[in-house]
Amino acid sequence: MKGRFFSFEGPDGAGKTTMITKLESFLREKGFDVLLTREPGGVRIAEEIRSIILNPKHTEMDGRTEALLYAAARRQHLLEKIIPAIKAGKIVLCDRFVDSSLAYQGFARGLGIDEILQINQFAIDGFFPSLTIYFDIDPKIGLERIQKNKQREINRLDMESLSFHYKVREGYLKIAERFSDRIIVIDASKPVDEVFAMTIAAVMDQIEGR
């Protein structure tokens, strides 16, 4: 079977990670060979970069530094883990990818979507997912979910203002409109079962070539 690459995006607290975990189980039950991974991280070097980026103590980090660190982690992750898995015929489910950088650093940080895209084009050399699912939710609801989740570790980006998180969402919606051939938007405020059904439908359409 031909390998596939799917990425999943959303503001903090959209339930993205929960959906990906459920999707992984669903696909495995169907007999697919699945790799679940995340960004920043996924491989040792990228995980070390992740610890630097998300450390709550690093409040002085410049936006461009942040963007470059994400791109560096992404490059290593792609070469070391994602591409080999796709070549081996696996279905790769990635919790965040390029679009996170476009929304967070490009739009919310005000560095420019095109500028951040250019940095990432250099990092990934044109290797985009075949499909990206963006889980959309009001940031206020998302942050309330995070605060209720006692098991989730609070990172540096969680500590940003509510207005920043609204900018992130606005950035995502602009990106989804611009790259509508690759990105689909799912309303994550709907019941979990409904969101999951839409997620499965979108992924299976790609896998089965519908």
UniProtKB/Swiss-Prot annotation:
<dbReference type="InterPro" id="IPR027417">
    <property type="entry name" value="P-loop_NTPase"/>
</dbReference>
<dbReference type="InterPro" id="IPR018094">
    <property type="entry name" value="Thymidylate_kinase"/>
</dbReference>
<keyword id="KW-0545">Nucleotide biosynthesis</keyword>
<dbReference type="GO" id="GO:0004798">
    <property type="term" value="F:dTMP kinase activity"/>
</dbReference>
<dbReference type="InterPro" id="IPR039430">
    <property type="entry name" value="Thymidylate_kin-like_dom"/>
</dbReference>
<protein>
    <recommendedName>
        <fullName>Thymidylate kinase</fullName>
        <ecNumber>2.7.4.9</ecNumber>
    </recommendedName>
</protein>
<dbReference type="Pfam" id="PF02223">
    <property type="entry name" value="Thymidylate_kin"/>
</dbReference>
<comment type="similarity">
    <text>Belongs to the thymidylate kinase family.</text>
</comment>
<dbReference type="GO" id="GO:0006233">
    <property type="term" value="P:dTDP biosynthetic process"/>
</dbReference>
<comment type="function">
    <text>Phosphorylation of dTMP to form dTDP in both de novo and salvage pathways of dTTP synthesis.</text>
</comment>
<dbReference type="GO" id="GO:0006235">
    <property type="term" value="P:dTTP biosynthetic process"/>
</dbReference>
<keyword id="KW-0808">Transferase</keyword>
<dbReference type="GO" id="GO:0005829">
    <property type="term" value="C:cytosol"/>
</dbReference>
<dbReference type="InterPro" id="IPR018095">
    <property type="entry name" value="Thymidylate_kin_CS"/>
</dbReference>
<dbReference type="GO" id="GO:0006227">
    <property type="term" value="P:dUDP biosynthetic process"/>
</dbReference>
<keyword id="KW-0547">Nucleotide-binding</keyword>
<feature type="binding site">
    <location>
        <begin position="10"/>
        <end position="17"/>
    </location>
    <ligand>
        <name>ATP</name>
    </ligand>
</feature>
<dbReference type="GO" id="GO:0005524">
    <property type="term" value="F:ATP binding"/>
</dbReference>
<keyword id="KW-0067">ATP-binding</keyword>
<keyword id="KW-0418">Kinase</keyword>
